[in-house]
Every structure is written in structure tokens, then in C-alpha cells.
């Protein structure tokens, strides 16, 4: 990363001085690629736009890790949900204000890896999977494996998402979004603790869900993205009513509603895919 002084004329567009040296204004940052020798100039405004919600989500993910290590699993689960809410706001605000930048995309992806890749895996491991050692040496390693499958799935999902920006159908996600996968694991922890269930009793379900969420994230199963709802223009009354109803249901019993809701969303992809395949196979040849 290179930060330079303004040129003599103060022109932001001028990159070379009279001696042919590359110069960067103080309010801009240059990212230099050692492999290609290319230089990408990023304005401070782009960094500020990306920092707000993404940094908040990153902090929430970090808080989830720290509180889980202290044994405060409900707080850790809530922190993951807060990270998800901030991440959703970040993307929505960027699309509404047309302030999406390359720096913002990369920074958001790194924050997502912490909040929805590492944090949920560590929370579910600390809460339930580490107790699998009581079942024997092999089972303890399977607990490690389940947590790693989830983490690797999140990393691959985020990398694939970055490479498909601009070419993928915005109506659908390819693979389960990492915030939704994280919400399923966080919901399991919060729901179980709220109902007096110990992690040592939930190790089997916890390991299965962790591995399943990791696999769904890297699958080709399509999930509806809800990006067609444009809040910049007129929003249908039914859409607003649905949002209000969702908030009402969540306030009734947050851990139960959030866990069941995100679990249904995670299962909706495979179910819809199987239904479509069945309909396709049942069609007569030539149609």
C-alpha cells in the first residue's frame, strides 16, 4: 500500500510528475500488485463507505469468538445475528446509494469470513463438538472435521461469490449464503441453551448441521436472494406487511423463530431443486 503527496498543481487525476515518478494524492491509496505490476488507486471515500457496516459486522464476529471462549454462548450467538444484520444493511445501502466499490467488496468479504466462517465454527465447536471427545478419539476428530468443513465451505463460498459478481443471476444465490449458514448454527446454540439443553447433549445434531451447512454453501443449489425488492422505488404493500410480520414473529420468541426460520431457508434450496428435477423427469420427451 502506497500513500503519496499531492502533485504540484493539486490535480487528482495527474499520476506522474515532471520526472516521471508515480505520485498519489494524500487522500488516495494505491494498491500495488507485485505479480502484475499494476496499480489500483482507491479514494478515501470508497474506504469510508466500506468501513461502517462491514467493520461493525467484523467486530460482532470477533465478539462472538471472544464470548464463546469465555463460555457465554447465547451472547456469542446474538453477536453472529448482529453481524448478519449489519452485513445485510451494508449490501442493501451500497446498492441503494450506488456506492459499491472494489475495496468495499474485498473488505466485506474478509469481514464475512471472520463473522460467518470462523466465528460460527468456533462457537459450535466450543459449545458442543469439543464434548465429542467423551465418545472416543475418533469421534473427537470428527468434531474437528465437521467444524473445518463448515469453515472451508464458507471460504470457498465467499471466493466463488467474488468471482461471479456481475455475471451471476442476482435473483438467486448459488449455494447457501454464509450469513444464513451462520444463522442456523447460531440459532441452534441459542435455541438449545434457551431450552436448557447442554452442548454435550447436542453434539450429534451440531456436527451434522455444521457439516451440512458447509456442503450447502459450496453446492450448486439455488436460493432466492430477495434482491428484487427495490427500496429506492415504490415497495409493494404486501412486501412491507411481510417485513412487519417477520419482526413481530421474531419478537415473540427470538431463538425459536430465528433458528426455525433460517433452517427452513437452508432446506428450501434442496427441496425446490428436487421438486424441479422431479417435474423435469416426469415431462414426456419432446416437450
Predicted regions and their residues:
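Hydrophobic alpha-helical signal/anchor motif
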Residues: 1-3, 24
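N-terminal periplasmic "start-of-domain" segments of outer-membrane beta-barrel proteins
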Residues: 10, 15-46
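Topogenic membrane-insertion module of multi-pass membrane proteins
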Residues: 48-88, 272, 287
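Select subsegments of transmembrane alpha-helices in polytopic membrane proteins
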Residues: 50-57, 109-116, 174-182, 234-238
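Multi-pass membrane catalytic core of lipid/isoprenoid biosynthesis enzymes
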Residues: 52-54, 96-158, 188
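Helix-coil boundary and interhelical linker segments in multi-pass alpha-helical membrane proteins
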Residues: 63-78, 120-145, 188-205, 251-255
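Short juxtamembrane and helix-loop transition motifs at transmembrane-helix boundaries
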Residues: 69-75, 100, 104, 135-144, ...
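C-terminal membrane-associated helical module and adjoining short loops/tails
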Residues: 170-287
